[in-house]
């Protein structure tokens, strides 16, 4: 009886010892699995969190910055005052604006410039503007070279006859010349007549300083007159015989 009593006790003891371990193992497995899933969820959630931190700028702010860059596409380097102005318009910090321009100059600006070159309407407008500026520069330079000449600028014509070819070239009127130039061309012969009328042998123009020969002649005349006066004095002083 004791052996039988001991037998069941011995047979029951392993069951009692093993049963708690078997009943606890599924709970431990589930807890471990839940912990692993939580860890993996955290690991997977990290990139999304980083993406949210890196997030894109607001669309309205980006539009304002792109418009400014397109207007200043040939010199897309805003000054500190312009950055401050853009910061007030876009509600972004100066650091965000600086970083956006650094990236936009590498990624967005080349496409803007290429689109500007390939656009036929913009290219046609720029061509017209360049042609208009060229015409304005030429029109501004022409009056400086061939403006209306005053009386001081009119050159007197030579008194000797000109060759036939030169006379024919001067007689032919220039179709592009202004009326003021035609008037000066008509006034030139009048000046020629005035020059030819003036007599070069007027007494006012003749002076001993201009002609050295006349000065020596005058000296001889003075010496002769002085000698004649001396002879007359000698005759008067001599006693009569």
From Swiss-Prot:
Read off the Pfam families from this record: Homeobox_KN (PF05920)
Please give the residue ranges the record annotates as the region Disordered.
1-58, 125-207
Task: Name the principal localization, coarsely classed.
Answer: nucleus
Biased region (Polar residues) positions are: 10-39
Keywords assigned: DNA-binding, Homeobox, Nucleus, Transcription, Transcription regulation
**Top-level taxon:** Eukaryota
Residue intervals annotated as DNA-binding region are 48-111
- CDD domains per UniProt: homeodomain (cd00086)
Family, according to the entry, reads as follows: Belongs to the TALE/TGIF homeobox family.
The UniProt entry, under PANTHER family, shows:
HOMEOBOX PROTEIN TRANSCRIPTION FACTORS
Name this polypeptide is given:
Homeobox protein TGIF2LX
Lineage of the organism = Eukaryota, Metazoa, Chordata, Craniata, Vertebrata
